[in-house]
Amino acid sequence: MVLNLLHLGRIGYAQGLELQRQLVEARHSGRIGNTLLLLEHPPVLTLGRNSERKNVLASDEFLAYRGVEIHEVNRGGDVTYHGPGQLVGYPILDLRSFAESGERGRLGAVEYVRWVEEALIRTCADFGVQTQRVAGRTGVWTLPGGSVEEKKIAAIGVHISRGITSHGFALNVTTDLRDFDLIVPCGISDRKVTSLELEVIDEPALTMEKVIHSAARQFGRVFGHQVLWLESPGDLLPELATLTQS
């Protein structure tokens, strides 16, 4: 099977939501195949279905002053931050296309999240960074060592409707981690966040482009798809040709 891959650069969060909405409908109707969007967002806080507003530590006025948007969305999870230097991925997949891998004729929600985690663990490993899952906590974490506890390097929050996935993951690459001080990331107050840039040892020239290519390759492998790089959303649906243009 083919995984359509779109690298969109940096786009507004509202644009990303609208693009996902249209692609989910197109995937459900069979107009497009499985698709992965890779992109960055300007500074934004998103609150998932399980969010508590107390986990946003900054006032609306301060966020506006800093130019940080805030959106309530229908993904799972609590509050998270997106911003420059962070690779965001939105898989638009029909879980029924993985019928042989799951129960009841499709890949289950928990299995799907584990697969996303696995692709990100392999991506980090491409840069010499060993990561892991942590029981009871979705996402990807560095390994603890000595007195240093594990840190979160990638957050995951998904939505599944009629078997079609949306939302997805955020991998900190060269993210300014000070922006996470605006929130209690994912509602977890006893662990810190980190980035590939801080964790790599033998990759002095770490770039977003390298991480994008690694993530695309690893998602293709984990999900058993051949990756097909596309130039623009219009290559998927003609009506999307101008959606992400400034």
UniProtKB/Swiss-Prot annotation:
Substrate binds at residues 75-82, 155-157, 168-170. The active site is at 186 (acyl-thioester intermediate). Pathway: Protein modification; protein lipoylation via endogenous pathway; protein N(6)-(lipoyl)lysine from octanoyl-[acyl-carrier-protein]: step 1/2. The record marks 152 as: Lowers pKa of active site Cys. HAMAP family: LipB. Belongs to the LipB family. This is Octanoyltransferase. It comes from Acidobacterium capsulatum (strain ATCC 51196 / DSM 11244 / BCRC 80197 / JCM 7670 / NBRC 15755 / NCIMB 13165 / 161). The gene is lipB.
